[in-house]
């Protein structure tokens, strides 16, 4: 039976904590249904983690003890999140290649 307080809360759009919890759980279930999470086994995630670290380690020195790779779900989207603390770059600094348009713009500015 709905109490007067429940009716007022419903009319004003207020929700109970359990309703919020239920909604969050449902969103998580829906997100997992949309992405075939069963194909992302622990072995596959470990392999992805190693390959990502191998590529990044070619360019920068990583603090491997602090590396964190996880799957996070928010707003019906699952993301692979990698936190890779960088100690320093391998060559001392990272140099970015400029494309022709950027080079021309730099020359125009210097004139």
From Swiss-Prot:
GO biological-process terms attached to the record: cell division; regulation of division septum assembly
Keywords: Cell cycle, Cell division
Database matches in InterPro entries: MinE, MinE_sf
Function: Prevents the cell division inhibition by proteins MinC and MinD at internal division sites while permitting inhibition at polar sites. This ensures cell division at the proper site by restricting the formation of a division septum at the midpoint of the long axis of the cell.
HAMAP family named among the record's database cross-references: MinE (MF_00262)
Family stated for the protein in its record: Belongs to the MinE family.
Official protein name in the record: Cell division topological specificity factor
Organism in which the protein naturally occurs: Prochlorococcus marinus (strain MIT 9312)
Lineage: Bacteria, Bacillati, Cyanobacteriota, Cyanophyceae, Synechococcales
Gene name of the encoded protein: minE
């Amino acid at each position: 039976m709905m109490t007067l307080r429940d009716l007022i809360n419903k009319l004003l759009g207020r929700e109970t904590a359990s309703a919020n919890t239920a909604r969050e759980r449902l969103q998580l279930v829906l997100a997992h249904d949309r992405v075939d999470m069963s194909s992302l086994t622990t072995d596959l995630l470990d392999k992805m983690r190693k390959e990502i670290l191998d590529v990044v380690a070619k360019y920068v020195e990583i603090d491997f003890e602090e590396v964190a790779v996880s799957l996070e779900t928010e707003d019906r989207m699952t993301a692979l999140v990698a936190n890779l603390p960088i100690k320093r770059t391998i060559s001392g600094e990272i140099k970015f290649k400029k494309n022709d348009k950027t080079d021309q713009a730099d020359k125009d500015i210097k004139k």
